[in-house]
Amino acid sequence: MSRKYFGTDGIRGRVGEYPITPDFMLKLGWAAGMAFRKQGHCRVLVGKDTRISGYMFESALEAGLSAAGADVMLLGPMPTPAIAYLTRTFHAEAGIVISASHNPHDDNGIKFFSGQGTKLPDEVELMIEELLDQPMTVIESGKLGKVSRINDAAGRYIEFCKSSVPSSTSFEGLKLVVDCAHGATYKVAPSVFRELGADVTVLHAQPDGLNINEGCGSTHIESLQAAVLVGHADLGIAFDGDGDRVLMVDHTGAIVDGDELLFIIARDLQEHGKLQGGVVGTLMSNLGLELALKDLDIPFVRAKVGDRYVMAELLEREWLVGGENSGHVVCCNHTTTGDAIIAALQVLMALKRRGETLAQARQALRKCPQVLINVRFGASKVDPLEHPAVKEASAKVTDALAGRGRVLLRKSGTEPLVRVMVEGEDESQVRAHAEALAKLVSEVCV
């Protein structure tokens, strides 16, 4: 069954444009509350990132949930994975996150977690969509949901993050620069690393509701690179606005992406006999990751793009580690979703156990040149991925790469974009192919 509202990562869009409006959020809160309380009374946790519209949508969701008879526990600004963790530990029926992740402040969105802290099952999302098309009713006054605030939410999550590192491990002597993107990690991330002994310089941890992800964080890593070099830090850590993505910068200023972080974590687990199976990447994972894992006899499979699909593949195979090159890294031995702080801690622990710098650790993975071009397709009625000319050109590029590279064309699940990716051994050839395909996609979208 097709979805009317939910994309690959919940509901997302521009604030003030349907469905990212207060009236829709009121109805969404009610529909979610009705779906969650099918089995009787229920409790729902609600958290958000730091964008200004989060306060407005928090109030609307709270009212809708209460009207459906669901109790609401407000977390305030918290990383998305923290909301998943707290939903599980509070034995709530569901968790709701108000966030547009790495997008600018004038976007916002909603995503849900099940009571187990995982992405909501498809059937529950479809049930919510069905209820959204029904008239809203209010439960009798004596059964209205109550609202409370969890005042120690940040402290609970900080202790959880620290518990993912053995008590015998200290990061004393490690000099870090941490970029919080003026987002949801701004309070908890610096505390976690400092309490584990690291010397931490913090960037972009003064959210004002409008500056989330603005020229900072994992999508704008230049200022972190500069700070690492100027401060002679051992490495830098960049989070996105809601704290489910992480990228790093080594002491030379080089960017270390999700594929490389995933490799470092998987290798460390294998060396300590804790890997359990293999590694899940995505269609966008660099071919170099697959080859480096193969050298270690670590199985590797590709899921569709999106951390929910990585998680689904991990659960089906009962494996522990997966992720995306964008910086979503899932460590199922600790979390039920991508958690940027947890992933960063696992990398730091791996470096300490091997006695390596980040620059040294990443050398074992030789990335193949990969060019990604985003093409905006607007309101065009033409599906560029099904256009005969695009299909023919894609097939020709695949033939030209002669089994030593890949071509991937896909639509973004969160934005009106077609992502054109070409990967191979020769960077100039790869770039030429990618630019030609992107130009063709742009032309057929007009």
UniProtKB/Swiss-Prot annotation:
Q: PTM Phosphoserine: at which residues?
A: S101
The catalysed reaction is: alpha-D-glucosamine 1-phosphate = D-glucosamine 6-phosphate
GO terms for molecular function, please? magnesium ion binding; phosphoglucosamine mutase activity; phosphomannomutase activity
List the record's Gene Ontology CC terms alphabetically: cytosol
Signal sequence bounds: none
State whether keyword Ribonucleoprotein applies: no
PTM summary from the entry reads: Activated by phosphorylation.
The record's comment on cofactor binding reads: Binds 1 Mg(2+) ion per subunit.
Annotated GO biological process: carbohydrate metabolic process; peptidoglycan biosynthetic process; UDP-N-acetylglucosamine biosynthetic process
The cofactor(s) it depends on are: Mg(2+)
Q: Which Gene3D superfamilies does the entry link to?
A: Alpha-D-Glucose-1,6-Bisphosphate, subunit A, domain 3, Alpha-D-phosphohexomutase, C-terminal domain
- List positions binding Mg(2+): S101, D240, D242, D244
* InterPro entries linked: A-D-PHexomutase_a/b/a-I, A-D-PHexomutase_a/b/a-I/II/III, A-D-PHexomutase_a/b/a-II, A-D-PHexomutase_a/b/a-III, A-D-PHexomutase_C, A-D-PHexomutase_C_sf, A-D-PHexomutase_CS, Alpha-D-phosphohexomutase_SF
Which sites are catalytic? S101 (phosphoserine intermediate)
Its Enzyme Commission number(s) read: 5.4.2.10
| Keywords of this entry | Isomerase, Magnesium, Metal-binding, Phosphoprotein
Give the family from UniProt. Answer: Belongs to the phosphohexose mutase family.
Database matches in NCBIfam families: glmM (TIGR01455), PRK10887.1 (NF008139)
What does the UniProt function comment say about this protein? Catalyzes the conversion of glucosamine-6-phosphate to glucosamine-1-phosphate.
Write the protein's name.
Phosphoglucosamine mutase
UniProt organism field: Pseudomonas putida (strain ATCC 700007 / DSM 6899 / JCM 31910 / BCRC 17059 / LMG 24140 / F1)
What gene does this protein come from? Answer: glmM
